[in-house]
């Protein structure tokens, strides 16, 4: 509940559509691989099961983040593929019993995107293109975090997503 309040407070201070640079500390992420939605409805069921498992695990193990986010790997971004590669929840350092990825400390280009999940892919493309237009190098993965989602709002157009892309500044 505390994490949800922090996210709602942050959501009230940002301007949707704005891209800015932010510095983040290292963070540990428990992950599940995202299924390939293009091939079968069965994969959607597997995705829902994985997300449910991830949320349940996070609650039982004291994760500071209850809502799973998405990770789009750098290699996918470079190919122009904006579908998520992993789903994640933040976990404390030293967590075991789950596949982990580390979000490196450093500078991130951050886009606060307001809109449905279906519009997220275009927003990821916009963020990647902005980074390249500014002369920055992509230096890592893109992380999606829900600030306002279907739990907080029934209107998908009011969802607020935080998209963070690791960059290298000149």
Positions of PLM-derived features:
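A solvent-exposed interaction/effector surface
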Residues: 1-170
